[in-house]
Amino acid sequence: MAAPEAWRARSCWFCEVAAATTMEATSREAAPAKSSASGPSAPPALFELCGRAVSAHMGVLESGVWALPGPILQSILPLLNIYYLERIEETALKKGLSTQAIWRRLWDELMKTRPSSLESVTCWRAKFMEAFFSHVLRGTIDVSSDKRLCDQRFSPLLHSSRHVRQLTICNMLQGATELVAEPNRRVLETLASSLHTLKFRHLLFSDVAAQQSLRQLLHQLIHHGAVSQVSLYSWPVPESALFILILTMSAGFWQPGPGSLPCRLCGEASRGRAPSRDEGSLLLGSRRPRRDAAERCAAALMATRRKSEVKQVPRALPTSRVTRRSTQESLTIGGTDSKRELYPPATSYEASGTKQPSSAPTAASSSTSSKRAPASSVSQPKPLKRFKRATGKKGPRTRQGSGAESEDLYDFVFIVAGEKEDGEEMEIGEVACGALDGSDPSCLGLPALEASQRFRSISTLELFTVPLSTEAALTLCHLLSSWVSLESLTLSYNGLGSNIFRLLDSLRVLSGQAGCRLRALHLSDLFSPLPILELTRAIVRALPLLRVLSIRVDHPSQRDNPAVPENAGPPGHIIGDEEIPENCLEQLEMGFPRGAQPAPLLCSVLKASGSLQQLSLDSATFASPQDFGLVLQTLKEYNLSLKRLSFHDMNLADCQSEVLFLLKNLTLQEITFSFCRLFEKRPAQFLPEMVAAMKGNSTLKGLRLPGNRLGNAGLLALADVFSEDSSSSLCQLDISSNCIKPDGLLEFAKRLERWGRGAFGHLRLFQNWLDQDAVTAREAIRRLRATCHVVSDSWDSTQAFADYVSTM
């Protein structure tokens, strides 16, 4: 009897609230009301008045509201503001109540945008709160404009931050300064545990303060947080310093900015333990390699150049270059800016005018010393070389604030030119001191190595339409060579050009690192100095552990491009005629430029990819049907694990016998022929042959034929696949964009009913001519839904008039 008594007690409490609310409403009605042009409105219902009163006093009544019976609570939920509605979610679920419809209505009324049709919203509360956080942060929504958003007892940012899984920073880094401000410290701490994806869109030039705020934000969210993915979109003219800052922070490198306070979390983590020589390798984790000499020196340079008003003296030309073998080849191939030369920077004692040290420290070991170039007879050690910024300015200049910060970032990048591959020591010309191998950094006035730290890094990096200059490409390549935590890399329309050779070099070095986790690479661009198949071979050789490779080149390669110095070809270690070693590819997607492709090159990749499960060829053209048949024969012999095969925008009108070979001999689960002109020639003869092959194929589960001008006759012929004498297990059929009319679809539905095969899965009917007879189309779809799940649309078939004329 305890539960009914509690229920009655809560009901009585609610009645008391109702009575008080009624008296308050009656007293207000007794007061003279203002005249209204629309006339007096109907008085609200008693229950609604009670709900409003409860909602207005939730600060006092919250615990009582949570204990209300389900039917009463269900009527109060739509009257609560978003803060209490979010807080009561768990209680509502326990009582069997859902708030999803309320959150959806709030989205429609307040956000006033419609989600993408491709987006499947599983939780409208999380979606609303995430969008609400972004709008409040950017100042695009006024919380005081709607009582459902305004409550003095709650902070909009703090309350919604725990629902944020994806944050977008736009334009001039709006929101970064607000998030790192002290009043929002708890907001940032919550974001550090909830945020997984950080996106940058349409970035513009930003000031020093904004970049410093971004530095602190990235340090908190990536190094001490849970962010695992960073994506950059649509940045036509990247600001070098900002771009390099985002990349280096994403890779786990951290140096406090000039004048910034020490990181509280870093202090807590390092409190109570003494720094050691292996500090860098400990921060990398057990699976990450220790930083090499060039990287440590670059990080040390970043720490020492935070001095204001430090003048540089005019630089002399270097007597020897700091080179890496593969990088030097790349520079020879890709060329360098004629205005950019290698200049040695002034060391700290040269820049400040102080006296240099009287002696240089000894090398770390005899074996290390023996690999170095002979030291100069001059007793004074020469400064470390680096690239000069492409500003066109020479001579002394004052470095202050952002200038020093920008120089530090460039120092970090271009020291990479001195890194030797395969673990070899660096040749520093006449600098014989052991600074670069970490033996004594003080010989160049650098701090101890412990001043530079590397923290947690992201696992997914995406660059969409972000042109990469030579400096930016060098930055990316250097970071990639030791970025062992990276699992997925997407480079889309970045204008790499000849920098693709540097990228391949860095990926090859990364693949050799212990614990390398890169398993997915998505690469697309307008042009490539290598033909797409040679580029694919080079990538597969460089990354034998890759699981997913998606590559697209829109325009043909030009080997005789005058931009390549002396018409030099690619390095011999990047392309070659030797056999491709066995790899771990499971998914391969290729988008080809116009022009016939050499089938043997594609076959060589397929032969080395015995684990391939999914293959997609887009716009591929072969010299003859025999070449296409050679590819299919290779798939049959070497790719026994292949489950999904897709062809898009390929002219297969002359490859009908090869298509029949595919259907009869490959044990696939899904085949896609998208806009392949499959039935353009001999449809009356080819369709029955194709249907017969499919009826005997018991492994095929999905067939996609969009854009092949199937028509009513072809659809009715295809219906025979589901006849009683068929052994086909087809359960997914896509016949979108196939000039199908309502009467043909109705007859197709009747045949399926006649054979009584039962539900066979999904049927897609997008962009067909079903609007020519709406009644017949509805009847056909009604009959089909008894057999399968139908997905269609209300497409205007007049848009396909040109296609109709071409089939007459």
UniProtKB/Swiss-Prot annotation:
GO molecular function, one term: identical protein binding
Biased composition (Low complexity): 357-379
LRR repeats by residue range: 483-503, 514-526, 527-551, 609-631, 632-655, 697-724, 727-748
Modification Phosphothreonine occurs at: 327
Record Gene3D superfamilies: Ribonuclease Inhibitor (3.80.10.10)
List of residues that carry Phosphoserine: 155, 276, 326, 369
Assigned GO CC terms: cytoplasm; nucleus
Positions of the UniProt region annotated as Interaction with Elongin BC complex: 45-54
UniProt keyword annotations, A-Z: Leucine-rich repeat, Phosphoprotein, Repeat, Ubl conjugation pathway
Basic residues bias locations: 383-397
Region of interest (Disordered), ranges: 269-289, 304-404
Subunit structure: Part of an E3 ubiquitin-protein ligase complex with Elongin BC (ELOB and ELOC), RBX1 and CUL5. Component of a probable ECS(LRRC41) complex which contains CUL5, RNF7/RBX2, Elongin BC and LRRC41. Interacts with CUL5, RNF7, ELOB and ELOC.
Function: Probable substrate recognition component of an ECS (Elongin BC-CUL2/5-SOCS-box protein) E3 ubiquitin ligase complex which mediates the ubiquitination and subsequent proteasomal degradation of target proteins.
Notes on the domains: The Elongin BC complex binding domain is also known as BC-box with the consensus [APST]-L-x(3)-C-x(3)-[AILV].
Protein name: Leucine-rich repeat-containing protein 41
